């Protein structure tokens, strides 16, 4: 298979469940079969609900105290399953990867989006904001399906590295409606599936991919966002010079009360682009990630020297690229629909129904 998934597979996603640990208790609804992941030879076939225990040891996996399967196992279900108390759509796979056994949930992308949406946006928010988030989540998933095709035994994991996903947990009517009303819709730029980044609160202006990721991307150039203003609350954090020097040791920083500390900002967004401490230059994104997003929640900040350290003051939360979620909330409050919201934050994109477009999509890969 080449780097483009066949059209028929574009709506299937493989999610690594990073937080699920052995032993595994699997409650399967309805008919299912289990087979060897590598050789596809059948292990179990059942027509009724069943509880299966999977135990991992140094030799492989044991199913209901029978056999040892070092090549991995697939539980193919019709009606989903419960794994260690969490309910999921789709099928379950145990796959040997990098000298360990990883757990992967394979399911339809529409069901995946239903599992993502309530963890990335409050289900109580306006429907148009939820619909915009559903399209962004679906597009982001599709982007990684295409990007990782035939490279890894999974497309995404269930953490903030990609999108938070926890099966059917927190599922409700609003979530189902937002996903169903935007079924199959994704955002594309010049026909390619985009990386629909989003963050909580931009602080008045979304940031550019160039500033945050080091690559200029036409649809992630940053826009003034008046729609989140009501939610902006300044934050302040302090660090001693010792703490600052320890955190930035890899950058040879030795700051004291006599040091010069300056910030370069983007003229469009006003957000920090570079930090200069004496003769040491640090990009704002490296400064933020090294000190931790807890101390530097966004790139919209200033630094003030005090006698024993620095005070960092800013506004906003998250990397700031792409859709501002509180901005989407504000736009929905003033009757903007989900397509208007998406096109506001992702400049120049089209919203298309991937199930109606008879083509093989490609991801718009730009080095991320």
From Swiss-Prot:
<dbReference type="GO" id="GO:0030435">
    <property type="term" value="P:sporulation resulting in formation of a cellular spore"/>
</dbReference>
<comment type="function">
    <text>Might be involved in sporulation.</text>
</comment>
<dbReference type="GO" id="GO:0030288">
    <property type="term" value="C:outer membrane-bounded periplasmic space"/>
</dbReference>
<dbReference type="InterPro" id="IPR051922">
    <property type="entry name" value="Bact_Sporulation_Assoc"/>
</dbReference>
<dbReference type="InterPro" id="IPR013486">
    <property type="entry name" value="SpoIID/LytB"/>
</dbReference>
<protein>
    <recommendedName>
        <fullName>Uncharacterized protein BHWA1_00569</fullName>
    </recommendedName>
</protein>
<dbReference type="InterPro" id="IPR013693">
    <property type="entry name" value="SpoIID/LytB_N"/>
</dbReference>
<dbReference type="Pfam" id="PF08486">
    <property type="entry name" value="SpoIID"/>
</dbReference>
